[in-house]
């Protein structure tokens, strides 16, 4: 005879550290997320990106509400995703550095500006997406930003994808 679910008072609630480590066991791709507002480029490393829909084509990104990127992407209404390959690890490290200067942060990152949105896109990314924001959903300490894809490009010479797993960058090799 099976027992029912345990009484809620008998269960331990997960703590933030355990949750973070458990999520670290889920391998994700690594991307550069960009936006541009008031003639200033904003960029950050993001692994919390996924497709939402094919018709219409939608992507989502999760953005920390306390970070400077949050208000910029909401103000701009458009953003770009560049999918990183293994040689882009220095870019991923740089754009994940808290407190880096806003002005000139893309000076060391070879990029161009998207034709549809004007956001910075990595020159040799595995693929790029330009998006226009269609919805923003508050979600705890982050916002889920949903965007309609208005442009897609793919590298003619795809390389090894950069992954993030157990708090480290990895590749499939």
Stretch-by-stretch model annotation:
Residues 1-173:
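Basic, polyanion-binding surface patches
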